[in-house]
Structure formats: structure tokens, C-alpha cells
Amino acid sequence: MVSIRPDEISSIIRQQIESYDQSVQVSNVGTVLQVGDGTARIYGLEQVMSQELLEFEDGTIGIALNLEEDNVGAVLMGDGFGIQEGSTVKTTGQIAQIPIGDAMVGRVVDSLGRPIDGKGPISSTATRLLESPAPGIIERKSVCEPMQTGITAIDAMIPIGRGQRELIIGDRKTGKTAIAIDTIINQKSEDVICVYVAIGQKASTVAQIIDTLTEKGAMAYTIVVAANANDPATLQYLAPYTGATLAEHFMYQGKSTLVIYDDLSKQAQAYRQMSLLMRRPPGREAYPGDVFYIHSRLLERAAKLSDALGGGSMTALPVIETQAGDVSAYIPTNVISITDGQIFLSTDLFNAGFRPAINAGISVSRVGSAAQTKAMKKVAGKLKLELAQFAELEAFSQFASDLDAATQAQLARGQRLRQLLKQPENSPLSVWEQVAISYAGLNGYIDTIPVDKVTEFAQGLRDYLKANKAKYVEIINSSKALTDEAETLLKEGIKEFTQGFAA
């Protein structure tokens, strides 16, 4: 027979009483009333925050968007096929956040920071909220450093500075993405962390871009965020904020970053789809009333931080696709008004073989000229004016039969300058190369070269200077200024090469 010891029993009871946890865990649970088309209506979620993450019974995550009197409207971050009417939903107490850190560099992730490149999990413990407030007025400083794109037409006429927002706008198939990718490739020696955000694009297109970046060695400093065309509208809407959050982490560490949103038209369409399904009232072109705000709060996060905060920067290159060149549509005008300038790509120029097909007349950079390198500012100051006057004369000369010698000379130079600015894809130029060809074009050295030989001349001149005028290359690379010595060397080099080329 087992002997029962009262003191032992009382000590066990005492232990149980002492270790009793009085805390009450409240679980906020609701019921799905209706689900479909990537949205759900939920009844019974009494205490839920706007934009809070919700967890459905099958593990799908949603975001609470509409907080109404008797129900909550949520958008889903998955297909939602496992969610049924009457199934339960619980709040998580969290707003959307993603992992951040150095481990993200070189990876391809989705809108929630989950890896989709098949290279295994990302070992990052730090997280950051997707929606962060933009830096205030005191936290910013004026744009003062150049962001070299490697594309002569942009760096000479529409210069971009670190911390600027420069819109790339044009019809489909005019080379918008090519400009963005060239800019990433050109940052190889610049110590800039790049983030490329692909919104609503074909998976094959994104794969091709990743291959190009890998081949050029650019994935070593680039993060790709992809929300493909077959992903839910919620993920396409969140993708740009994910890109901004990843770049922000590095910006506040004092680094320079570059974010490309390709393209924000698709994000606006995804947001329109979500809003209409949530029964929000439509406005112009059926977009909801706050479609301006989704872009302004995204692009305001790009900044050049003050020295007190480390002097880091986030440069944003948003892309917008126009329909038949209509820049006055709703989304294009919205984004033009938020950004610090735009690079307009023309279908006519593209089809005529002038690539990059930049229309210099209506492209502008509002703050970039303050950040342009001294050498480029000195050389290319009148390039934009020359090309604009040439375009005007060219249109006029179609109706005039006899032109005076000065007009003919201006037309001849304009044709050669336009040829000089042609540049193949994925081959950005360094500053000394851009300065050399701009100098040759604007100072009359190519006026006697046949138009069809100008591209060949530019390539040959760059090779000649690299081989024979290393001192010029060294001065430009180190000082970024066209000193008297550098200009003398450049003149000598151009004259020597021109004589040999003509012969």
C-alpha cells in the first residue's frame, strides 16, 4: 500500500499555486462572410488596426483595408482558395514588415521579403515596417552629388543627383527599362546599393533582367523585388514599398542607394482593382480618390539626408508607361507633379533608330544641374539648346527649298550630335568618355565627318584617348573637372585622331 505524505502533497499544491500564470491571452477572432477575387469580408473583428495583418484558417495572410461599422474588408496576399465562408480569421497585432540587412543584397525576393530565387532562406533577424514616414525638412539637405547613369544624353542634358526623384516616362517598348538597367550597371564602381522593383511584369522579362545583371556583375550590389503579373494585386501594390524599405535601411546607414520602380502604372492599376473590389467610390479613370497619395508617400521617402544623419541618399527612378504618348493622363500627370523632373522617351525617335530615344525638348531635371560634374557642366552646357534648335530647324526645313549657309551648318551639326548620342544597350560610358565625345561634337571637330561614320568615330576616339592620353583620363577620373591641362590633352587627342580617321 502506497503511503500518502501530507507535507509532500501540500508542497506540490503550493508550487502549482506559485507558478500559476494569471495573464489572460485575448484572441481577436472573426468569421468570413464572403471571399473571392482576392478580397474577403469579415464579421466580428472588433479591435483591428488599419493595415493590420490578419491570419486566415488556411494560413493565408491578409491586410485589413476597410474598417466599416459591422464588418472588415481585407485584401489577400495569396490565392485564397483554401478560405471558405464561415471559416475563422484572427488578428496578428502586426503591421506589414519585411526582413532587412546585408543578407538581402544579391537576392531576388517577393513583396514580403521572402526569397524566390531558389538560393535558400535569407539569414536576417532585423525587420522594418513597410510604411515608414518620409524624412522631414530638417533631416534633408540639397542634392549635391551626381548619380551617373552612364548614358551620355542623360548625364549631359538631364543630369540626375543623389537623392533626386527622376521619372522615366514613355510608351511601351521605347527603352524605359533599358535606361534603368544601364544605370544599375554603371554603379559598379560607385559603392551604391541598387534595388530593382518589378511590378506586374512577365516572369520571363524579370528572369532576363536578372540574367543581364548577373552577367554584368551587378547582382553583387543589387536586390530585385518581383511581384509578377500572375501574383495577387495586393503583392503588386506592396512591391514598391518593399523596395523603398530595403533601400531606406542602407540610406540611414549613410550609404547611397538607387531604387527603380518598374512601373508605377501597374501599381496604380493593382490598387484600382483592390479598391473597386472593396467597393470604394471610383474617381477619374475609375481610380480611387487616394491614388495620388499612394505615389506621393512612396516617392517622398527618396531623399538626400543631412550630414547629422550620415549623409546617405535614396535616388528614385520611377517608370510610367503612357498610352499613345498621352502625358496628360491621370497617373502620368500625378507622378510628374511629385518628381523632380522627367526623361521622356519618344516612339518616333525609337523607330527612327535613335536609341536611347530621349526627347530632349520636353525632358527636364529640376535639381540635377546642381549635382552635375564640373567637367560635364563646362562641356555640355549648350548641348540641350543646340539639339532643341536643331529639332525646330529640322521641322521648318522640310518646307523650305533653299536654306542659307548658317542654317545648313546648324542642321549638319545637329544631325551629327544626334548620332553622337546614340548608345547601345548595356554599355554605359564613364565620365571621361562622355566629356570627350561631347567636347568633340560641340566644338566642330565632327562637322566634316560623314553622318554615317559618327558612331564609328566616337568609338575610335574613346579607344585612342584610352591608349594614348592616359593623363587626360586620370585627371577627369580624379578631379571630375576639365582643367586647362586636361582640355589641352583632349584637343591634341581629338586632332591627332581626326587626322588619322580622315586619312
Curated annotation (Swiss-Prot):
It is an enzyme of class 7 (translocase). It is a peripheral membrane protein. The keyword Zinc-finger does not apply. GO terms for cellular component: plasma membrane; plasma membrane-derived thylakoid membrane; proton-transporting ATP synthase complex. F-type ATPases have 2 components, CF(1) - the catalytic core - and CF(0) - the membrane proton channel. CF(1) has five subunits: alpha(3), beta(3), gamma(1), delta(1), epsilon(1). CF(0) has four main subunits: a(1), b(1), b'(1) and c(9-12). The record marks S363 as: Required for activity. Its EC number is 7.1.2.2. ATP binds at G170, D171, R172, K173, T174, G175, K176, T177. Keywords: ATP synthesis, ATP-binding, CF(1), Hydrogen ion transport, Ion transport, Membrane, Nucleotide-binding, Thylakoid, Translocase, Transport. InterPro entries: ATP_synth_asu-like_sf, ATP_synth_asu_C, ATP_synth_asu_C_sf, ATP_synth_F1_a_nt-bd_dom, ATP_synth_F1_asu, ATPase_a/bsu_AS, ATPase_F1/V1/A1_a/bsu_N, ATPase_F1/V1/A1_a/bsu_N_sf. It comes from the Bacteria. It catalyses: ATP + H2O + 4 H(+)(in) = ADP + phosphate + 5 H(+)(out). Produces ATP from ADP in the presence of a proton gradient across the membrane. The alpha chain is a regulatory subunit. GO terms for biological process: proton motive force-driven ATP synthesis. It is found in: Cellular thylakoid membrane. The keyword ATP-binding applies. Gene3D superfamilies: 2.40.30.20, ATP synthase alpha/beta chain, C-terminal domain, P-loop containing nucleotide triphosphate hydrolases. This is ATP synthase subunit alpha. Belongs to the ATPase alpha/beta chains family. GO terms for molecular function: ADP binding; ATP binding; proton-transporting ATP synthase activity, rotational mechanism.
